[in-house]
């Protein structure tokens, strides 16, 4: 049993293969407290860790210091306005304009299943191995039920958390904050790790000490964003990739979020994660229910690397639903950086004809095929084919591509509307806008109000018609701007604070319909590159475009930060042109291919115009993809070295689950003069197996796994920046 309640000790034990998460009930089963989370411990009395036997004591023993108790008690879900001055997990506004709320324990349930979250992405359990603890809590004054959900995925060392809130009073109440998880523990010299960025440099790792007060990252942009990521970890300062204790939370959501650590006056840490409370409110009428999105929580006693592999396995096994989850994805070529808006059927077929000869398996037609769109100023929302560009329409183009033995895919941006469009002329009220205020344009477009079912239905029918008109097997779903001017003509004044969350729910509903109606469709999400690369999107699409920056060297740090928590199979990665269109850098074609191999792998350039020697490498690269993709897609990822840290080289590897095969990628970013070969210690191998290095220059390139991990392998020192090397080891 993963979950056990000890009636005598009032302790809930949530156990995974390597961890224990202990919850305690205090003061005659009134308060739900956090006792312990970390390495798995034997079943014993841990109640002393709640410190209820020392001042200020529990309220039943010392009512005069109830406030002090609230302000120090390690709560599993903190109330608001009654004495705990740390960050609250929930806040309300009543009809009387008051804000106090304090859920206390009522009862519990343990169930052998993983409940779904209505309208939200969430982890699933197809093998029926997970268990769920539901702690029923209530604020008796407000008649507000607050149910805390904990699902234990034992083999993944993962716990998911979410909250169900139900209003049983006769009056409506407004939620002004509803976090998904709260975790209190003593500080132990922890540092905080988050991911920051911008367009073209997403998910850069940032590790820093935790000072007193609140340290947070978040987004109020209507999506998870380029700038911050809905993830945080905290660890001892001595923790590395291979050693040390690491705690991590990841939000399975695609909208506004906050991830925060707070160090208190007594050196305790409070970690919270959930929907960002800025501009948020949700009206709960009598007997209505609100579900918070889910948080994935893990602990590793073996450094960041084990944390990474916990997330990778968990998302592959329990979050990605697509039929492509365990399948090799087709090698695609996207025409965006090849042509931008300047294309027609002839140009696309020229690219496809050559691509088909080189082993590329799908042509993806990007932005510019619809309405009268020849630049970014027009036609979003007008989802009909521009037959001036594509004479004969999609049917002719797709048929011709299929005749070449290739699949066909298409780009769409369903959430957006151009002021210069037929749709906007017909329905200007469909854009998110504040009445009387001039809308804020971004990329010459507004955002459609996806909180409205009539808007979603109209757009969905347009998408469905396009996808049904030809043999389209892939969709790139883009979102090229963030939300501003938050206002909906369909929501009353006291529900305007619901817009951002309802918008995200609308996107989820659209993608749920799409994947249901077109179950064989390969969906790739995108948002101006990687602005909506989050677990919520991963639930609907098995891969997400990692960044619009396709430069191989820039991609090293982008893909490092992404692979910290996401499986390599989820990262959209392409070989692109040089000089690179974002940074102007020239890198070897070989390096571009080998860096893109640590992702979905594809091409984004006009292969009819590149040098002959580069064209000749494409069949080698497509063969490389087919040879190694099963290993890359399913194996365990190990970060060996980071160019971000050493400013010299980058190295990572993937090891098969049975440890009989490994692929090492090494990139020399900056060559150095007068150096010996570099010794690199590998990870994750079986120390008792011998490994043959495929393609080794010596006759007998066989090394023990223990030797490769402890003594290391040698990488030659050669002239030239941006050189890459692949080393394939197979158990002998």
PLM ranges: what are they?
Residues 670-732:
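C-terminal beta-sandwich/jelly-roll accessory domains of carbohydrate-active enzymes
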Residues 391-393, 425-427, 431-590, 600, ...:
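Active-site neighborhood of glycoside hydrolase catalytic domains
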């Amino acid at each position: 049993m993963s979950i056990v309640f000890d009636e005598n000790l009032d302790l809930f034990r949530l156990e995974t293969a390597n961890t224990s998460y202990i919850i305690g009930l205090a003061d005659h089963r009134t308060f739900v407290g956090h006792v312990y989370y970390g390495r798995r411990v034997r079943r014993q009395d841990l109640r002393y860790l709640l410190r209820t036997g020392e001042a200020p004591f529990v309220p039943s023993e010392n009512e005069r210091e109830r406030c002090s108790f609230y302000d120090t008690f390690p709560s599993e879900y903190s109330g608001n306005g009654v004495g705990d001055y740390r960050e609250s997990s929930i806040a309300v506004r009543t009809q009387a304009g008051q804000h106090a709320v304090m859920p206390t324990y009522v009862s519990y349930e343990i169930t052998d299943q993983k409940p779904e979250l209505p309208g939200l992405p969430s982890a699933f359990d197809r093998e029926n191995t997970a268990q769920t603890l539901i702690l029923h809590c209530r604020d008796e004054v407000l008649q507000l039920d607050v149910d805390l959900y904990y699902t234990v995925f034992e083999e993944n060392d993962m716990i998911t958390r979410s909250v169900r809130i139900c209003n049983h009073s006769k009056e409506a109440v407004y939620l002004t904050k509803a976090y998904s998880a709260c975790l209190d523990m003593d500080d132990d010299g922890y540092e905080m790790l988050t991911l920051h960025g911008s367009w073209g440099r997403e998910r850069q790792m940032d590790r820093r000490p935790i000072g007193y007060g609140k340290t947070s990252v978040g987004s109020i942009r209507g999506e998870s964003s380029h700038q911050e990521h809905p993830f945080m970890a905290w660890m001892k300062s001595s923790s590395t990739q291979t050693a040390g204790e690491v705690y991590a939370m990841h939000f399975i959501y695609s909208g506004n979020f906050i991830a925060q650590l707070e160090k208190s006056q007594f050196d305790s840490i409070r970690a919270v994660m959930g929907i960002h409370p800025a501009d948020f409110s949700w009206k709960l009428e009598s007997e209505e229910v609100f579900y918070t999105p889910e948080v994935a929580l893990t602990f590793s006693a073996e450094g960041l690397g084990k944390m990474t592999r916990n997330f990778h396995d968990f998302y592959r096994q329990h979050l990605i639903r697509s039929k492509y989850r365990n399948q090799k994805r087709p090698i695609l070529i996207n025409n965006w950086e090849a042509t931008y808006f300047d294309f027609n059927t002839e140009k696309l077929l020229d690219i496809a004809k050559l691509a088909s000869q080189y082993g590329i398996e799908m042509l993806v037609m990007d932005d510019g095929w619809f309405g009268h769109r020849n630049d970014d100023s027009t036609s979003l929302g007008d989802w009909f084919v521009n037959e001036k560009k594509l004479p004969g329409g999609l049917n002719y183009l797709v048929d011709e591509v299929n005749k070449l033995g290739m699949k066909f895919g298409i780009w769409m941006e369903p959430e957006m509307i151009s002021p210069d469009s037929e749709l906007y002329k017909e329905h200007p009220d469909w854009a998110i806008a504040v009445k009387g205020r001039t809308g804020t344009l971004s990329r010459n477009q507004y955002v459609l109000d996806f909180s409205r079912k009539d808007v979603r239905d109209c757009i969905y029918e347009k998408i469905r018609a396009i996808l049904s008109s030809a043999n389209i097997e892939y969709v790139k779903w883009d979102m090229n701007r963030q939300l501003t001017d938050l206002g909906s003509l369909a929501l009353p004044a006291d529900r305007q604070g619901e817009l951002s969350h309802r918008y995200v729910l609308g996107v989820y509903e659209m993608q749920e319909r799409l994947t249901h109606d077109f179950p064989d469709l390969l969906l790739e999400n995108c948002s101006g590159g990687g602005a909506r690369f989050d677990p919520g999107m991963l639930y609907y699409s098995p891969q997400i475009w990692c960044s619009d920056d396709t430069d191989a060297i820039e991609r090293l740090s982008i893909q490092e930060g992404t692979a910290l928590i996401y499986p390599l199979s989820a990262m959209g990665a392409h070989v692109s042109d040089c000089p690179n269109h974002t940074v102007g850098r020239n890198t070897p074609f070989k390096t571009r291919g080998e860096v893109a191999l640590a992702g979905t792998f594809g091409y984004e350039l006009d292969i009819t115009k590149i040098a002959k020697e580069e064209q000749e490498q494409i069949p080698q690269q497509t063969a490389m993809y087919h040879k190694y993709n099963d290993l890359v897609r399913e194996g365990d990822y190990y970060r060996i070295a980071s160019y971000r840290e050493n400013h010299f080289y980058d190295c990572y590897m993937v090891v098969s689950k049975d440890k009989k095969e490994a692929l090492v990628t090494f990139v020399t970013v900056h060559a150095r003069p007068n150096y010996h070969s570099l010794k690199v210690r590998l990870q994750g191998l079986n120390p008792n197996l011998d490994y043959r290095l495929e393609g080794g220059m010596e006759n007998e390139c066989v090394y023990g796994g223990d030797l490769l991990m402890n003594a290391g392998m040698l990488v030659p020192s050669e002239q030239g920046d941006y050189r890459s090397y692949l080393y394939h080891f197979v158990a002998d």
